[in-house]
Amino acid sequence: MYKRKLTASDLLLIIVNLIPLYCVWFEGWSASEVFLVYCLETVIIGLVNVLKMASVTLFVRKTDTWENGGRSSMQSGWFFIFFFIIHYGFFVFIQTQIFFAVSRLIPNGSFLGSYAKIPALLGNNGKLMLIIFVAYYTVQTLFEFFTSGKYKTVSMGRLMFEPYIRIFVQQFVVILGSIFLNFGAGKIFILIFVVAKIFFELFINFNRFLEIAEKRERLKKEREQQI
Protein backbone atom coordinates (compact mmCIF):
# COMPACT_ATOMS: atom_id res chain seq x y z
CA MET A 1 0.00 0.00 0.00
CA TYR A 2 3.00 2.28 0.44
CA LYS A 3 5.38 3.77 -2.12
CA ARG A 4 9.05 3.27 -1.32
CA LYS A 5 10.85 4.98 -4.19
CA LEU A 6 10.41 8.61 -5.20
CA THR A 7 10.36 9.46 -8.89
CA ALA A 8 11.02 12.66 -10.83
CA SER A 9 7.26 13.16 -10.93
CA ASP A 10 7.15 12.94 -7.13
CA LEU A 11 9.85 15.60 -6.79
CA LEU A 12 7.89 17.84 -9.15
CA LEU A 13 4.79 17.30 -7.01
CA ILE A 14 6.71 18.43 -3.91
CA ILE A 15 7.87 21.61 -5.65
CA VAL A 16 4.41 22.42 -7.02
CA ASN A 17 2.83 22.14 -3.56
CA LEU A 18 5.61 23.96 -1.72
CA ILE A 19 5.26 27.02 -3.98
CA PRO A 20 1.84 28.09 -2.60
CA LEU A 21 2.95 27.23 0.95
CA TYR A 22 5.99 29.50 0.63
CA CYS A 23 3.97 32.27 -1.01
CA VAL A 24 1.30 32.26 1.71
CA TRP A 25 3.85 32.36 4.51
CA PHE A 26 6.47 34.69 3.05
CA GLU A 27 5.00 36.53 0.05
CA GLY A 28 1.67 37.59 1.50
CA TRP A 29 -0.56 35.43 -0.71
CA SER A 30 -4.12 34.97 0.49
CA ALA A 31 -4.75 31.60 2.14
CA SER A 32 -8.35 31.80 0.91
CA GLU A 33 -7.22 32.04 -2.72
CA VAL A 34 -4.91 29.07 -2.28
CA PHE A 35 -7.63 26.93 -0.68
CA LEU A 36 -9.95 27.81 -3.55
CA VAL A 37 -7.34 26.64 -6.07
CA TYR A 38 -6.93 23.35 -4.20
CA CYS A 39 -10.69 22.97 -4.36
CA LEU A 40 -10.57 23.57 -8.13
CA GLU A 41 -7.80 20.98 -8.43
CA THR A 42 -10.61 18.43 -8.39
CA VAL A 43 -11.91 19.91 -11.64
CA ILE A 44 -8.45 19.85 -13.23
CA ILE A 45 -7.98 16.18 -12.35
CA GLY A 46 -11.40 15.34 -13.79
CA LEU A 47 -10.69 17.13 -17.08
CA VAL A 48 -7.32 15.41 -17.40
CA ASN A 49 -8.98 12.05 -16.80
CA VAL A 50 -11.53 12.74 -19.55
CA LEU A 51 -8.65 13.41 -21.95
CA LYS A 52 -7.00 10.13 -20.92
CA MET A 53 -10.20 8.17 -21.48
CA ALA A 54 -10.77 9.87 -24.83
CA SER A 55 -7.21 9.03 -25.92
CA VAL A 56 -7.69 5.35 -25.07
CA THR A 57 -11.00 5.29 -26.96
CA LEU A 58 -9.60 7.02 -30.04
CA PHE A 59 -6.22 5.34 -30.33
CA VAL A 60 -6.31 2.00 -28.49
CA ARG A 61 -9.76 0.40 -28.24
CA LYS A 62 -13.26 1.54 -29.11
CA THR A 63 -15.01 -0.64 -26.52
CA ASP A 64 -14.23 -2.14 -23.11
CA THR A 65 -15.83 -4.31 -20.44
CA TRP A 66 -18.47 -2.57 -18.33
CA GLU A 67 -19.09 -4.12 -14.90
CA ASN A 68 -22.51 -3.56 -13.35
CA GLY A 69 -24.03 -5.50 -10.47
CA GLY A 70 -21.97 -8.61 -11.12
CA ARG A 71 -22.78 -8.56 -14.82
CA SER A 72 -20.46 -7.51 -17.59
CA SER A 73 -21.02 -6.20 -21.10
CA MET A 74 -19.04 -4.49 -23.82
CA GLN A 75 -19.65 -0.76 -24.02
CA SER A 76 -18.27 2.06 -26.12
CA GLY A 77 -15.48 4.09 -24.61
CA TRP A 78 -17.67 7.16 -25.08
CA PHE A 79 -20.22 5.57 -22.77
CA PHE A 80 -17.54 5.34 -20.06
CA ILE A 81 -16.62 8.97 -20.66
CA PHE A 82 -20.24 10.15 -20.52
CA PHE A 83 -20.84 8.21 -17.30
CA PHE A 84 -17.67 9.62 -15.73
CA ILE A 85 -18.56 13.21 -16.65
CA ILE A 86 -22.04 12.90 -15.11
CA HIS A 87 -20.95 10.99 -12.00
CA TYR A 88 -17.74 12.92 -11.33
CA GLY A 89 -19.41 16.21 -12.24
CA PHE A 90 -22.12 15.60 -9.65
CA PHE A 91 -19.42 14.77 -7.10
CA VAL A 92 -17.56 18.01 -7.89
CA PHE A 93 -20.79 19.99 -7.62
CA ILE A 94 -21.54 18.60 -4.15
CA GLN A 95 -17.98 19.17 -2.95
CA THR A 96 -17.81 22.76 -4.20
CA GLN A 97 -21.21 23.60 -2.72
CA ILE A 98 -20.09 22.28 0.67
CA PHE A 99 -16.85 24.22 0.37
CA PHE A 100 -18.68 27.44 -0.51
CA ALA A 101 -21.11 27.01 2.38
CA VAL A 102 -18.49 26.18 5.01
CA SER A 103 -15.82 28.67 3.95
CA ARG A 104 -18.29 31.49 3.25
CA LEU A 105 -15.92 32.74 0.58
CA ILE A 106 -18.82 33.25 -1.82
CA PRO A 107 -21.91 35.11 -0.56
CA ASN A 108 -25.27 33.45 -1.03
CA GLY A 109 -26.47 33.84 -4.58
CA SER A 110 -27.80 32.00 -7.58
CA PHE A 111 -26.38 28.66 -8.68
CA LEU A 112 -24.57 30.04 -11.72
CA GLY A 113 -23.78 33.28 -9.93
CA SER A 114 -21.69 31.48 -7.30
CA TYR A 115 -19.45 29.86 -9.88
CA ALA A 116 -19.24 33.06 -11.92
CA LYS A 117 -17.58 34.76 -8.94
CA ILE A 118 -14.70 32.28 -8.77
CA PRO A 119 -12.35 34.07 -11.25
CA ALA A 120 -12.58 37.31 -9.28
CA LEU A 121 -12.01 35.51 -5.96
CA LEU A 122 -8.92 33.76 -7.30
CA GLY A 123 -7.10 37.01 -7.93
CA ASN A 124 -3.86 37.16 -9.90
CA ASN A 125 -1.97 34.92 -7.48
CA GLY A 126 -4.68 32.28 -7.46
CA LYS A 127 -4.83 32.27 -11.26
CA LEU A 128 -1.05 31.87 -11.43
CA MET A 129 -1.23 28.92 -9.06
CA LEU A 130 -4.03 27.42 -11.14
CA ILE A 131 -1.85 27.66 -14.26
CA ILE A 132 1.00 25.95 -12.38
CA PHE A 133 -1.33 23.11 -11.40
CA VAL A 134 -2.59 22.71 -14.98
CA ALA A 135 1.01 22.60 -16.25
CA TYR A 136 1.95 20.05 -13.58
CA TYR A 137 -0.88 17.66 -14.43
CA THR A 138 -0.15 18.06 -18.14
CA VAL A 139 3.49 17.06 -17.65
CA GLN A 140 2.55 14.25 -15.25
CA THR A 141 0.04 12.83 -17.74
CA LEU A 142 2.51 13.05 -20.61
CA PHE A 143 5.18 11.04 -18.80
CA GLU A 144 3.20 8.68 -16.54
CA PHE A 145 0.36 7.88 -18.93
CA PHE A 146 1.58 8.30 -22.50
CA THR A 147 5.38 8.01 -22.51
CA SER A 148 5.24 5.01 -20.15
CA GLY A 149 2.79 3.24 -22.48
CA LYS A 150 0.18 2.85 -19.74
CA TYR A 151 -2.54 4.10 -22.10
CA LYS A 152 -2.11 0.95 -24.19
CA THR A 153 -3.02 -1.49 -21.41
CA VAL A 154 -5.16 0.28 -18.80
CA SER A 155 -8.85 -0.64 -18.75
CA MET A 156 -11.51 2.03 -19.08
CA GLY A 157 -13.09 0.87 -15.82
CA ARG A 158 -9.81 1.27 -13.96
CA LEU A 159 -9.17 4.63 -15.58
CA MET A 160 -12.65 5.87 -14.74
CA PHE A 161 -12.23 5.28 -11.00
CA GLU A 162 -8.58 6.30 -10.59
CA PRO A 163 -9.27 9.90 -9.44
CA TYR A 164 -11.79 9.07 -6.73
CA ILE A 165 -9.75 7.72 -3.80
CA ARG A 166 -7.21 10.55 -4.00
CA ILE A 167 -9.95 13.17 -4.38
CA PHE A 168 -11.96 11.85 -1.44
CA VAL A 169 -8.97 12.38 0.85
CA GLN A 170 -8.04 15.76 -0.60
CA GLN A 171 -11.51 17.25 -0.58
CA PHE A 172 -12.15 16.14 3.00
CA VAL A 173 -9.05 18.05 4.06
CA VAL A 174 -9.93 21.08 1.91
CA ILE A 175 -13.40 21.32 3.47
CA LEU A 176 -11.87 20.93 6.93
CA GLY A 177 -9.45 23.70 6.06
CA SER A 178 -12.28 25.99 5.00
CA ILE A 179 -13.50 25.89 8.61
CA PHE A 180 -10.12 27.19 9.75
CA LEU A 181 -10.46 30.09 7.31
CA ASN A 182 -13.45 31.31 9.29
CA PHE A 183 -11.26 31.55 12.39
CA GLY A 184 -8.42 33.35 10.65
CA ALA A 185 -6.05 30.39 10.91
CA GLY A 186 -5.51 29.93 7.19
CA LYS A 187 -1.70 30.12 7.31
CA ILE A 188 -1.43 27.46 9.99
CA PHE A 189 -3.79 25.09 8.29
CA ILE A 190 -2.28 25.46 4.84
CA LEU A 191 1.00 24.29 6.37
CA ILE A 192 -0.73 21.22 7.79
CA PHE A 193 -2.68 20.69 4.58
CA VAL A 194 0.32 20.83 2.23
CA VAL A 195 2.40 18.51 4.43
CA ALA A 196 -0.51 16.04 4.65
CA LYS A 197 -1.17 16.25 0.91
CA ILE A 198 2.46 15.62 0.01
CA PHE A 199 2.59 12.67 2.42
CA PHE A 200 -0.53 11.02 1.01
CA GLU A 201 0.50 11.64 -2.60
CA LEU A 202 4.03 10.33 -2.12
CA PHE A 203 3.70 7.47 0.32
CA ILE A 204 0.19 6.09 -0.13
CA ASN A 205 -0.14 3.99 -3.27
CA PHE A 206 -3.70 4.81 -4.30
CA ASN A 207 -3.45 2.69 -7.44
CA ARG A 208 -2.70 -0.31 -5.25
CA PHE A 209 -6.21 -0.09 -3.80
CA LEU A 210 -7.65 -0.31 -7.31
CA GLU A 211 -5.37 -3.23 -8.17
CA ILE A 212 -6.61 -5.14 -5.12
CA ALA A 213 -10.23 -4.41 -6.03
CA GLU A 214 -9.64 -5.62 -9.60
CA LYS A 215 -7.92 -8.78 -8.35
CA ARG A 216 -10.83 -9.57 -6.02
CA GLU A 217 -13.27 -9.07 -8.88
CA ARG A 218 -11.29 -11.45 -11.11
CA LEU A 219 -11.15 -14.10 -8.39
CA LYS A 220 -14.89 -13.73 -7.83
CA LYS A 221 -15.57 -14.29 -11.53
CA GLU A 222 -13.27 -17.32 -11.60
CA ARG A 223 -15.11 -18.89 -8.66
CA GLU A 224 -18.47 -18.23 -10.30
CA GLN A 225 -17.29 -19.89 -13.51
CA GLN A 226 -16.15 -22.97 -11.60
CA ILE A 227 -19.56 -23.44 -9.97
What is the role of each PLM region?
Residues 1-11, 156-165:
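Short, amphipathic, aromatic/basic-enriched membrane-interface segments that mark the entry/exit
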Residues 8-24, 34:
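The first (N-terminal) embedded transmembrane alpha-helix
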Residues 20-28, 176-183:
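Hydrophobic alpha-helical transmembrane segments
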Residues 34-97:
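Hydrophobic/aromatic-rich structural module bridging two neighboring secondary-structure elements via a short loop
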Residues 75-103, 123-140, 165-169:
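Alpha-helical transmembrane segments of multi-pass integral membrane proteins
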Residues 101-123:
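Membrane-interface interhelical connector segments
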Residues 121-195, 206, 210-214:
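Hydrophobic alpha-helical transmembrane segments and adjacent short intramembrane/lumenal linkers
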Residues 207-227:
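Short, highly charged, low-complexity non-transmembrane loops/tails of multi-pass membrane proteins
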